[in-house]
């Protein structure tokens, strides 16, 4: 495929050809957010190597700077320096905190700022973020004594936060969401008494790993690590953080490499945290030819290189506890399902309806336009693969993961496609289009 930018908001995608080479995906988005945030509330200096220099982490950095944290320039390939202000050092900003398009930023900030007694904050973001539900964070925080006001009884930004001294206790999260869990863990750091957070299913655990590294008194227990207990009173201290490559970004190359005729790719330095490797388990279920090479550990996170070769894929069925471990990879798995002979089914994935877009609806709409055979359900998709996809006019509908998933679909289609909203990829993978152009043969 060749990629031709026809305007700032669209590109021409030409199908055909092979895919080979080595690629290093950007730093993990989830870890990048947390490294910035935990560094800002620690004492001393935190250095971050490999931080994702994309729009979402930039939103987190901007909010923290507005409250008094000193964060150095964020550029590709440069170590970022964060001078922490301590657990209670963040100050009232002079303006609304703009979280951009980042659900992680606004939800983690809610947990942190709700516990800043005597200070007041207003959090907002772009039009997409203002449509995303926030009560999943606000309601459990309210049980701890938080005061959060917003549209639709606090479910939609802008949100006004009046900082309080929060109470510890046993708090259940309404959904298996690392964002919700992390917000509660941040609130628990300065609560009155210990807090135990209980999830309905195990979500990604980057916050638990990193908070312990920074010095928090945090214990993980219960079935599959679903009970997390935080005892307040411990200071956090600056750390040297190395951010591995984002497996959610690697997923696009894994699927493309598994499907493009003759393809062989190596994706280097990918984070292999077991709460994030659901995509590898499903691809193995599909009999994709994937090897994990050079396994090692960096800053408490398992890392490795992934080699993928093209081969025939079998249909798959996913549901239940694996969904939180691959929730961001469902769009690219929907593309993969279109090229399997047989029926694939995704259920228990209603969480995708409240992402940057309604990803179930958007992927159904866009892939159907290419000729895919898809039934959309309340909580998932049924996809009958084996039909030839045709190049056509496509639209990311402002969603970064949709944009990159459709690029892979276009690579495998018959005929060219035009993608509107290609710039959305910059939210998590600023160099995606450059890497695609380089790897195409």
From Swiss-Prot:
Q: Which reaction does it catalyse?
A: 3-phosphoshikimate + phosphoenolpyruvate = 5-O-(1-carboxyvinyl)-3-phosphoshikimate + phosphate
- InterPro entries the UniProt entry points to: Enolpyruvate_Tfrase_dom, Enolpyruvate_Tfrase_sf, EPSP_synthase, EPSP_synthase_CS, RNA3'P_cycl/enolpyr_Trfase_a/b
Q: Active site at which residues?
A: 328
The record's annotation in Pfam families points to: EPSP_synthase
Q: Where does phosphoenolpyruvate bind?
A: 29, 103, 132, 179, 359, 401
User: In which compartments does the protein localize?
Assistant: Cytoplasm
Task: Provide the alphabetized UniProt keywords.
Answer: Amino-acid biosynthesis, Aromatic amino acid biosynthesis, Cytoplasm, Transferase
Annotated 3-phosphoshikimate binding lies at: 29-30, 34, 177, 179, 328, 355
Q: What is its EC number?
A: 2.5.1.19
**Entry GO CC:** cytoplasm
Cited CDD domains:
EPSP_synthase
Locate the transmembrane regions by residue number.
none
* Role this protein plays: Catalyzes the transfer of the enolpyruvyl moiety of phosphoenolpyruvate (PEP) to the 5-hydroxyl of shikimate-3-phosphate (S3P) to produce enolpyruvyl shikimate-3-phosphate and inorganic phosphate.
Write down the HAMAP family for this protein, in alphabetical order: EPSP_synth (MF_00210)
Name the family the entry cites: Belongs to the EPSP synthase family.
What is the protein's given name?
3-phosphoshikimate 1-carboxyvinyltransferase
Organism this protein belongs to? Prochlorococcus marinus (strain MIT 9313)
């Amino acid at each position: 495929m060749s990629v031709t930018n026809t305007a700032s908001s669209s590109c021409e995608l030409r199908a055909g050809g092979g895919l080979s080479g080595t690629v290093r995906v950007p730093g993990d988005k989830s870890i990048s957010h947390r490294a910035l945030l935990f560094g800002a509330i620690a004492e001393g200096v935190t250095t971050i190597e490999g931080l994702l220099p994309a729009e979402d982490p930039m939103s987190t950095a901007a909010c923290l700077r507005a409250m008094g944290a000193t964060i150095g320039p964020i550029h590709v390939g440069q170590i970022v320096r964060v001078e922490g202000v301590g657990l209670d050092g963040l100050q009232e900003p002079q303006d609304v905190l703009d979280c951009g398009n980042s659900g992680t930023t606004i939800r983690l900030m809610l947990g942190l700022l709700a516990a800043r007694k005597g200070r007041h904050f207003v959090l907002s973001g772009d039009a997409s973020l203002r449509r995303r539900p926030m009560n999943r964070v606000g309601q459990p925080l309210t049980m701890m004594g938080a005061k959060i006001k917003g549209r639709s009884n606090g479910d939609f930004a802008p949100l006004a936060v009046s900082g309080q001294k929060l109470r510890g206790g046993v708090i259940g999260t309404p959904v298996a969401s690392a964002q919700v869990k992390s917000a509660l863990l941040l609130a628990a750091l300065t609560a009155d008494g210990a807090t135990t957070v209980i999830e309905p299913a195990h979500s990604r655990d980057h916050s638990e790993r990193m908070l312990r590294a920074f010095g928090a008194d945090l214990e993980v227990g219960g079935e599959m690590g679903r009970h997390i207990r935080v005892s307040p009173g411990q200071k956090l201290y600056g750390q040297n953080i190395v951010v591995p490559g984002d497996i959610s970004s690697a997923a696009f190359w894994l699927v493309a490499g598994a499907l493009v005729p003759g393809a062989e790719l190596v994706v280097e330095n990918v984070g292999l945290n077991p709460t994030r490797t659901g995509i590898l388990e499903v691809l193995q279920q599909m009999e994709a030819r994937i090897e994990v090479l050079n396994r090692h550990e960096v800053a408490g996170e398992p890392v490795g290189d992934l080699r993928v070769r093209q081969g025939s894929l079998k249909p798959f069925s996913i549901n239940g506890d694996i969904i939180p471990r691959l929730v961001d990879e469902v769009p690219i798995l929907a593309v993969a399902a279109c090229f399997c002979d047989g029926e694939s089914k995704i259920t228990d994935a209603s969480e995708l309806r409240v992402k940057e877009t309604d990803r179930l609806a958007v992927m159904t709409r866009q892939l159907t336009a290419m000729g895919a055979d898809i039934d959309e359900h309340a909580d998932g998709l049924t996809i009958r693969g084996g039909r030839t996809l045709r190049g056509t006019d496509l639209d990311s509908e402002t969603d970064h993961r949709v944009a990159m998933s459709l690029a892979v679909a276009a690579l495998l289609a018959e005929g060219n496609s035009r993608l509107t909203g290609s710039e959305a990829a910059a939210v998590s993978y600023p160099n995606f289009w450059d890497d695609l152009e380089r790897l195409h043969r």
